[in-house]
């Protein structure tokens, strides 16, 4: 199908890690793939990125191959692989690609293309932000660390546009982190901590990881895009259509790409997330800095949507990783980058967080006033703790009045405060305050609208007793979810590190070791926790009995089933 490219093959496995796409949280094959033709499963191979690169290498020996996207970005260093229950090497080495782009990649790909055009091979490109490269020569690493000219390729001080010397941090080697031993897991946790501390373009250092006789080097992340650059990217002539080859029915009789329906009439207003939930890898991919589009850009895109023959008057979403983040968390982030050892939100929100929904309110008002727009929904998730920190309740009222259709989906995730701490979520009390305020505002507006909370079963830190706490709260509120999300240890998240190591790299004990974390690893205990969160299902009653007996809380059975 392809000829040999002029510059390089650019390879991605899609908008989701191929193993996540192909398998459920309980490691069972999925019955469908929303990103494939007709929603059929089986169109994308397991470990797709490695498979694709191997096929290209076989067909076009000596061609530049550059990998990017979610699968590449979140597997850029040694990482725990849930599906094989092992620690795997950097995907840059396993795939045998020449260069890896991590993060969103627009800045990096332009610089790389220019260097390729000037005659460099991909293996020779080592000075581009947002990339990982490798070498088998220790002399290359020594030269890099001793060089004086690397400074002009790295840290940019945004206040005066001068350059600053970078540090070089050697991560624990693959050999040190790969084993299932306490010592190896301590090293793994340390490696993850260092990686997480170096995801900000301003203050990140250069990371080096040794694997056998080779070294993987991560250059600092790309600088955040300006509003003007974001606008330029999203003004490109995207068709909002699948390729015509998918118009014909697949073997299951269905045509098209199902996943498109959710995003076809949605607007991406921002990138990045300073919420940094432990179970989410967006921070590892996009960083904590918020990059937002202008109102003009979003209104123009929405206006174009209204001309689409399939548009029914409804904009499905206006958001990003977190819908109500439109600005950096604080002024310090713009100057010094996101703090390495402090969270913006969570159980103890930083006092420097600058809370405002004014810009988002104005944007939503403009979108509502576009001719032929009947309703503007918000579906990509509201960070309710941030919302509750805002003393101005204008957005909360506008949200209930204009942007919900009967129910609002939110993610408290748990009720046990220790589990919430490990999740980096707010305390349960904050959710209850939010729930009360939501009810009050809707009553004031004369609307009957409901909250649909999402909960995770089996997250690191959650034992059976913690799951019982959730069950009791659900009984008290009269809401039991139809769907419960089982914790899924996917590459790149803090929670996955906790799952593998049973350690919390974000907290140290007095002796310098990392805090120990309880982890439900057996499939049966995960089923027990899930059953507790759905105790109302008749088929779960025996599992609930078993769970209550195991954690010594048999008395709860009468409360749940009275």
Question: What annotation goes with each model-predicted range?
Answer:
Residues 18, 304-452, 456-460:
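Conserved SAM/AdoMet-binding glycine-rich loop
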Residues 395, 459-475:
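Catalytic cores of alpha/beta
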């Amino acid at each position: 199908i392809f000829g040999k490219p002029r510059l390089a093959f650019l390879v991605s496995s899609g908008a989701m890690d191929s193993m996540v796409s192909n398998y459920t949280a309980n490691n069972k094959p999925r019955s469908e793939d929303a990103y494939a033709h007709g929603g059929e499963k089986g169109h994308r191979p397991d470990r797709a990125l490695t498979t694709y690169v191997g096929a290209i290498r076989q067909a076009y020996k000596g061609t530049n191959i550059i990998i990017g996207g979610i699968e590449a970005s979140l597997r850029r260093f040694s990482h725990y692989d849930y599906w094989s229950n092992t620690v795997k090497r950097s995907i840059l080495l396993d795939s045998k690609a020449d260069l890896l782009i991590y993060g969103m990649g627009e800045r990096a790909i332009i610089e790389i293309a220019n260097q390729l055009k000037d005659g460099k091979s991909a293996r020779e490109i080592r000075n581009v932000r947002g990339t990982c490269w490798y070498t088998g020569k220790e002399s290359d690493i020594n030269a890099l660390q001793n060089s004086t000219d690397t400074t002009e390729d790295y840290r940019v001080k945004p206040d005066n546009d001068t350059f600053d010397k970078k540090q070089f941090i050697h991560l624990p080697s693959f050999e040190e982190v790969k084993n299932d031993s306490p010592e190896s897991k301590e090293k793994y946790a340390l490696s993850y901590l260092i990686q997480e501390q170096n995801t900000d373009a301003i203050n990140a250092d250069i990371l080096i990881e040794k694997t056998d006789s080779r070294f993987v080097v991560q250059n600092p992340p790309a600088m955040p895009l300006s509003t003007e650059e974001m606008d330029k990217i999203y003004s490109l002539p995207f068709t909002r259509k699948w390729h015509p080859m998918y118009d014909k029915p697949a073997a299951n009789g269905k045509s098209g790409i199902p996943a498109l329906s959710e995003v076809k009439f949605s607007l991406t207003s921002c990138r990045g997330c300073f919420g940094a939930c432990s179970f989410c890898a967006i921070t590892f991919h996009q960083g904590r800095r918020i990059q937002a589009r202008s109102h003009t850009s979003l209104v123009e895109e929405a206006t174009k949507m209204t001309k689409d023959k399939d548009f029914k008057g409804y904009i499905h979403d206006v958001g990003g990783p977190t819908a109500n983040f439109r600005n950096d968390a604080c002024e310090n982030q713009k100057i010094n980058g996101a703090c390495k050892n402090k969270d913006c939100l969570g159980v103890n929100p930083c006092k420097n967080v600058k809370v405002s929904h004014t810009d988002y309110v104005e944007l939503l008002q403009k979108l509502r006033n576009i001719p032929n727009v009947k309703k503007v929904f918000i579906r990509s998730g509201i960070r309710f703790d941030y919302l509750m920190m805002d003393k101005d309740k204008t957005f909360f009222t506008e949200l209930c009045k204009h942007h919900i259709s009967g129910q609002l989906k939110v993610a408290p995730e748990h009720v046990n405060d220790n589990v919430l701490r490990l999740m980096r979520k707010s305390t349960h009390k904050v959710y209850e305050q939010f729930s009360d305020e939501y009810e009050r505002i809707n009553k004031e507006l004369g609307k009957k609208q409901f909250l649909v909370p999402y909960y995770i079963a089996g997250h690191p830190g959650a034992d059976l007793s913690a799951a019982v706490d959730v069950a009791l709260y659900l009984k008290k509120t009269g809401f039991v979810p139809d769907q419960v999300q089982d914790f899924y240890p996917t590459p790149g998240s803090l929670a996955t590190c906790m799952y593998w190591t049973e350690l919390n790299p974000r907290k140290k004990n007095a002796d310098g070791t990392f805090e120990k974390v309880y982890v439900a690893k057996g499939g049966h205990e995960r089923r027990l926790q899930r059953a507790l969160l759905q105790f109302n299902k008749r088929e779960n009653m025996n599992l609930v009995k078993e769970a209550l007996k195991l954690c010594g809380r048999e008395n709860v059975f009468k409360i749940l089933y009275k």
